[in-house]
Amino acid sequence: MNKILTTFILTICSLTIFAQDKTTDELKTLSDNKQYDKIIEQHASKSKDYSAKSLYYIGLAYYMKEDDNNCIKFMDLSINKDSKDPAPHYIKASTLNYMGKYNEAIKCFQTAINIKTDDAEFYSGLGDSYYQLEKFDLALENYKKATEQNECPDRPYSMIAQIYSDLKQNDKALEAFYTAKSKISKKSNSYINALFNIGLLESLKGNYDKAEPAFVELLQLDPTDYHSYAKLIQIYYNRKEYDKAKPYKDKLYEAHKKGLLKDNLKDMFCFDQFKWNDYLIQVFERYENENKGDIYNKHIFYVIDNSDKIVLRVQTEFSPISVELGGSKYLLCANKGATHYNSGIGFNDDLKYDDLKAAAIKLFDAYIK
């Protein structure tokens, strides 16, 4: 009788394990095919006796549907049945990151890492937690550990560079962006970001011969990155290669006409920057070019001191009266505080930038004491 009972119990256990394995396989297939709604609809309500891995797949479905609370609920159920599987610890930690619960996330990432020490995603997620808490040294440590593992994702390479950039350590940031460029896929947004920052940081160092190819490559990959057009224009103006800048200016005007430009490019773009005495000069050009009978600014020179304060503005102003009288289209004027100055110097659309710049600098000399 005891042998029969034992055999019966073993048979029941075998059938249960077989059923659980079958359910897990089914859930894995559904998950691989991204059928997350189906997983939730068909399995979430009857998962009481499911295996740890099956519960994990249900939690993963909630994770992909951005249902944070249910995701954590099922990850906890999975962990309670099998605490040695790193996957639910990692997904729970990632969810806690999304919820802004970074200290809780850190503990879960650390548990996942203790179980499996060679997963780059785990270190990357832990780096994200520390980054959000502005613990940059610990974030760097974990992003760097991520890059030491096999199959490292793009993010740690980008974030190492970003942290150095945040800390104003531009030389280290530039080196890290070059490393990121060499490691990550050209098809990713991270590659575009690396190119832009290489161009930006090389420009800040005055290495325009290195900045130019970075922006050119970026625009070949993404012709809608209009900030890169402006950066290339600045490079060419710095080198007095005005003919090279013109096609990129035309692209910005075309994009403006189509309503494609946003934020600080919506009304104007910076086409030159230079140092004058102890001041930074930023020069902008506005897209407006229509005679509506009103005065408008076309080219604007901002004179900025070491505290980032604009101490003087010099601009070409469209003058409808001058045009009506057959004179110049633009008059060179200046503003200092509430005071407006008219130099009496005129320009037209065929102006030479070197002449405009020289005239503007004379006004800097006149009005900055």
Go through each PLM region and give its residues.
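N-terminal leader/linker segments that initiate helical-solenoid repeat arrays
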Residues: I17-Y57, A61-E66
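Register position in tetratricopeptide repeats
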Residues: D32, M64, Y98-M99, Q132-L133, ...
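Structural marker of alpha-solenoid helical repeat scaffolds
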Residues: D49, K81, I115, Q149, ...
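Helix-start (N-cap) detector for alpha-helical repeat units in TPR-like alpha-solenoids
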Residues: S51-K53, P86-A87, D119-E121, D154-R155, ...
